[in-house]
Design a protein with these regions (language model features):
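Hydrophobic alpha-helical connector segments
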Residues: 62, 77-109, 128-135
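C-terminal peripheral helix-coil segments that are non-catalytic and often amphipathic
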Residues: 136-229
Length: 229
């Protein structure tokens, strides 16, 4: 067998560091992540690991990007798995289930993405592309719903002027026009799904809700009605 190239060795070592870092997330949480300890665990001297990740923050960024990409893969695969593309309700429900399933299978990575901010860490712009894959799935469905003329559920109020202005930051991600009312309704759905998943994962649903699966189905089916799918 020919010797591995430098690039192959680097990729293998980078993978080992990230794998150990994810294990450490489960053990101590992101705030206590120790690059030196990870280096020892994978058989490197502490100074050598900085050739791969110059700082703890860069290692955190790599973990965040990897986790967002894994969640993005799960969401996109779930959407693609619905064969009849005009069944927007089934596609939406598949996306919601994929988010929850991934979160429950990867609770520590989910907490890194959507839990308490890590003290002193500011995520760089490089994380936004991966993070945008999840919101992008919702926005694509919103565009298709607009194109099909789906009637939204009865509104409970009008979109506030400040919200209209804030939507200017969303529009660049849209390939076709979508009304402000519909964008806001889909943003509500997005926050509801992640709010439910976070409440469940972080242990805040133990009173009043006994069947988390049934409750999640009820919540997401109500969202289907609200979105007019």
């Amino acid at each position: 067998m020919p010797p591995k190239s430098r690039a192959e060795n680097r990729a293998e070592q980078t993978r080992a560091i990230l794998t150990r870092a994810r294990a450490q997330l489960a053990e101590v949480g992101p705030a206590a992540l120790s690059v030196r300890q990870i280096a020892r665990d994978v058989g490197l001297v502490s100074s050598a690991v900085y050739r791969y990740f110059p700082s703890r923050d860069e290692l955190l960024t790599a973990l965040i990007v990897e986790s967002y990409d894994e969640l993005g893969d799960a969401v996109e695969q779930a959407d693609a798995g619905v064969r009849r593309r005009t069944d927007l309700d089934k596609r939406f429900l598949a996306v919601c289930v994929a988010i929850r399933d991934w979160a429950r299978a990867n609770p520590h990575e989910y907490a890194l993405l959507y839990g308490s901010p890590v003290p002193g860490y500011v995520a760089p712009q490089t994380t936004t592309t991966s993070a945008g894959r999840i919101t992008g799935a919702f926005l694509r469905l919103a565009q298709e719903s607009e194109s099909e003329g789906d009637a939204l559920g009865a509104p409970t109020g009008t979109v506030a002027p400040k919200e209209h202005r804030a939507l200017g930051g969303v529009r660049p991600a849209l390939e076709t026009p979508v009304s402000d009312d519909r964008i806001v309704r889909w943003l509500m759905a997005w926050t509801t799904v992640f709010g439910h998943v976070s409440m469940e994962l972080f242990g805040h649903m133990h009173r009043g809700i006994l069947d988390y699966d049934a409750h999640f189905r009820q919540v997401t089916r109500q969202l289907v009605a609200d979105l007019g799918l």
